[in-house]
């Protein structure tokens, strides 16, 4: 019975593994270094996803209608170096400003003779450009970190809109004639309108009215507003000071000298409730600190002064103190309850004695421990929830307070964690540690060992091989050392950047991404924009074609997205030939170059269908370690990455059709699953959702159904 349950659990683990894969771009796109990729550039920021604040003039766009004629050293927040403001005879596009002025400069090959820069980041959405001669212009954007982004566009003698889809968050932009342009002569370069991407336009705020004597309300991330009333007493009352407030907090305190009823200040989201001076504790809410009302009944002698706890980030304790003549019998107090992101109510003393609060740090504050000189008293612990600390118990002697650290604080002694050893394992559970062998269940289904790659298509069997049962994946072994092909990091970075426009799992889901023309076009433009040079762009796009080779017939953009000025390197071994049918728009004209360069010339275009044969080198994704994926030639078919699991039974032999992998990819240890622990699953990062297109949805559905049947069978057999 036990063996049957273990076998069913192992089979479920195998099925779960078959539905997952490695996100190969993750190591290239880990931003754990302050929002930047460790050792690389920040994540690419397209204008569509930027959040720059714009001036009112930038919100409507620059049309230069209010700029004086002549030199244009500065306009709004920008420095226009090398530009002049002049009149233009060209008709503006609809909705692109008014007037007839433009910012004019010159462009030439190889050098930049103009620059537009700003002291803060900006994102240009679109330029309206006209040239003296039709040319291909390179727009070069300087980024805050010193990197550069560029895009290339062909502009004519009429007003040409130039869209910027890749280079957001820039500090400068300059232009020159691109090397692919037929025109190599220096010519006039006119900007008729600049449209900015403004997701957060700047706004003006109304003046704040003068404050009144009423307590200030508590709002987001604020501290408690406390009213303190001091009633006349035979003895001099102890001075009361409000708690200091720091980041995200402020205490509004009103003090009156006449006894009068007070109402608590209104509290809203993320604030703490101000309460009257009673013996009942004030409630705590999320992101707030407890406002504790303490009634101190002093002895005939003068009471000692009481100082409130300090306020730090996200927390502050405001204490209301009322001094009244009373006998020496101590009054019982109860701690205030603690809730999410709150601090613990303080314990009070039975006699007047100085108390010092525990240090408060980020998201936490330690409940203070007090000294009782008269009668030892204890208090019940206040309930603590998410991100709160524990109320301490009052003891007869003074004790040191436990330090508070990020997200937690414990004021009571805690037991040390005892390291878990193998003695804790039930004696009825067997532990198996194979040398380099692999686990294969007795169903003629070969389960690959723990290695670091992802599944791919089933290779065609040879004449001597036997096929496994229908519906099973077949894998071949990896070479002892995969052949690393050196894919430029710009490709996985761009794939990660633009995956957000799709419904795919992540940038490793190539079977979902490759058929998407918009995605492929955006990635290719991103590679062209952020590639260091043409060689890096060509190499990155070559790998993209290799990754998406099987989808070229259904998505010709995989081939046509390559810029005309970029030449892909020739394919040597392992090449595949794909026939692509594309529709292109080409100009049709018999006019001379002099005529086409005249202002106002409108070219004529026609649509043609082009059929061509493309040779690509398929590329597969293989990982030598879970965090180090590499690209290898497509001739290698790799089994999926499976973390070390706990098989329930151990096979006596390996099926003949399975190939034993080399030592380099064998797991270090394999253990049987404990009865109380669920069957482990493939913990890839990030975990892909269930739905990944039609194929993945079917596999995920079958996995869930199989798991349910297995669980039901296990219960019946048990």
From Swiss-Prot:
Sequence repeats lie at residues 217-243, 244-265, 266-282, 283-309, 310-336, 337-358, 359-382, 383-402, 403-420. Residues 452-472 are annotated as: Disordered. This is Adhesin-like cell surface protein MAD1. A lipid is attached at residue 693 (GPI-anchor amidated glycine). It is a lipid-anchor; GPI-anchor. The keyword ATP-binding does not apply. The lineage of its organism: Eukaryota, Fungi, Dikarya, Ascomycota, Pezizomycotina. Disruption phenotype: Reults in the formation of more traps in the presence of nematodes and an increased sensitivity to certain nitrogen sources as trap inducers. Lacks cell surface adhesive materials and leads to more porous cell wall structures. Affects the expression of many nitrogen metabolism, host-pathogen interaction and mycelia development related genes during sodium nitrate-induced trap formation. Keywords: Cell membrane, Cell wall, Disulfide bond, Glycoprotein, GPI-anchor, Heme, Iron, Lipoprotein, Membrane, Metal-binding, Repeat, Secreted, Signal. Residues 1-19 form the signal peptide. The CFEM domain is involved in heme-binding. It contains 8 cysteines and is found in proteins from several pathogenic fungi, including both human and plant pathogens. The tandem repeats might be heavily glycosylated to produce a rigid elongated structure that holds the adhesive N-terminal domain at the cell surface. Cell surface adhesion protein that plays a key role in switching between the saprophytic lifestyle and the predacious lifestyle (nematode trapping). Likely functions to prevent energy-consuming trap formation in the absence of nematodes, and keeps the fungus in the saprophytic life style. May influence the induction signal of trap formation by limiting the porosity of the cell wall and thus affecting its permeability of nitrogen source. It comes from Arthrobotrys oligospora (strain ATCC 24927 / CBS 115.81 / DSM 1491) (Nematode-trapping fungus).
């Amino acid at each position: 019975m036990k063996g049957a349950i273990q076998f069913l659990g192992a089979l479920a683990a195998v099925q779960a593994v078959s539905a997952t894969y490695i996100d190969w771009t993750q190591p290239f796109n880990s931003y754990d270094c302050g929002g930047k990729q460790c050792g690389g550039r920040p994540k690419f920021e397209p204008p569509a996803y930027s959040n720059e604040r714009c001036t009112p003039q930038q919100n409507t766009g620059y049309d230069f209608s209010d700029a004086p004629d002549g030199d244009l050293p500065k306009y709004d927040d920008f420095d226009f170096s090398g530009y002049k403001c002049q009149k233009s005879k060209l008709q503006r596009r609809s909705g692109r400003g008014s007037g007839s002025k433009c910012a004019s400069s010159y462009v030439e090959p190889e050098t930049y003779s103009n620059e537009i820069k700003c002291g803060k980041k900006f994102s240009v959405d679109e330029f309206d450009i006209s040239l003296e001669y039709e040319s291909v212009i390179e727009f070069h954007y300087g980024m805050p970190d010193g990197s550069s982004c560029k895009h290339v566009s062909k502009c004519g003698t009429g007003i040409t809109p130039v869209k910027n889809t890749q280079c957001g968050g820039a500090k400068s932009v300059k232009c020159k004639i691109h090397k692919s342009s037929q025109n190599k002569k220096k010519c006039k370069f006119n900007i008729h309108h600049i449209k900015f991407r403004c997701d957060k336009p700047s706004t003006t705020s109304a003046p704040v009215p003068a404050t009144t004597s009423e307590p200030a309300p508590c709002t987001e991330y604020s501290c408690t507003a406390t009213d303190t009333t001091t009633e006349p007493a035979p003895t001099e009352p102890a001075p009361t000071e409000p708690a200091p407030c720091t980041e995200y907090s402020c205490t509004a305190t009103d003090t009156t000298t006449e006894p009068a009823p007070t109402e608590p200040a209104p509290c809203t989201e993320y604030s703490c409730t101000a309460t009257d001076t009673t013996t009942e504790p004030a409630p705590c809410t999320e992101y707030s600190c407890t406002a504790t009302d303490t009634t101190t009944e002093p002895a005939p002698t003068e009471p000692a002064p009481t100082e409130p706890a300090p306020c730090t980030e996200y927390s502050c304790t405001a204490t209301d103190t009322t001094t009244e003549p009373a006998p020496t019998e101590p009054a019982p107090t109860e701690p205030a309850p603690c809730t999410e992101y709150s601090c613990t109510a303080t314990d009070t003393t039975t006699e007047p004695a100085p108390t010092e609060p525990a240090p408060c740090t980020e998201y936490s504050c330690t409940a203070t421990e007090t000294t009782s000189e008269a009668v030892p008293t204890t208090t019940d612990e206040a309930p603590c929830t998410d991100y709160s600390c524990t109320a301490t118990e009052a003891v007869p002697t003074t004790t040191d307070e436990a330090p508070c650290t990020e997200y937690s604080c414990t004021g009571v002694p805690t037991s040390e964690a005892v390291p878990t050893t193998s003695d804790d394992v039930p004696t009825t559970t067997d532990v198996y540690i194979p040398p380099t062998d692999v686990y294969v269940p007795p169903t003629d289904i070969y389960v690959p060992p723990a290695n670091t790659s992802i599944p791919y298509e089933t290779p065609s069997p040879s004449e001597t091989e036997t096929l496994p049962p229908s519906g099973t994946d077949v894998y071949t072994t990896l070479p002892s050392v995969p052949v690393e092909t050196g894919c430029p990091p710009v490709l996985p970075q761009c794939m990660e950047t633009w995956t957000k426009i799709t419904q795919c799992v992540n940038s490793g889901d190539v079977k979902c991404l490759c058929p998407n023309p918009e995605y492929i076009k955006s990635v290719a433009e991103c590679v062209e924009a952020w590639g260091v040079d043409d060689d890096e762009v060509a190499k990155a796009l070559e790998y993209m074609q290799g990754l998406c080779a099987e989808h070229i017939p259904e998505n010709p953009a995989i081939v046509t997205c390559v810029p005309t000025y970029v030449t892909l390197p020739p394919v040597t071994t392992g090449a595949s030939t794909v026939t692509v049918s594309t529709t292109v728009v080409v100009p049709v004209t018999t006019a001379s170059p002099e005529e086409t360069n005249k202002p106002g010339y409108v070219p004529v275009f026609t649509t043609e269908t082009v059929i061509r044969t493309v040779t690509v080198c398929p590329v597969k994704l293989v990982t030598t370690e879970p965090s180090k994926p590499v690209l290898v030639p497509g001739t290698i078919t790799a089994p999926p990455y499976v973390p070390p699991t706990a098989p329930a039974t151990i096979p006596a032999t390996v099926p003949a059709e399975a190939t034993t992998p080399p030592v380099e990819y064998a797991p270090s240890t394999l253990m049987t699953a404990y009865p109380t622990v669920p069957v482990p699953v493939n913990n890839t990062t990030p975990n892909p959702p269930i739905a990944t297109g039609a194929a993945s949805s079917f596999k995920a559905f079958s996995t869930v159904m199989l798991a349910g049947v297995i669980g039901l069978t296990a219960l019946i057999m048990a």
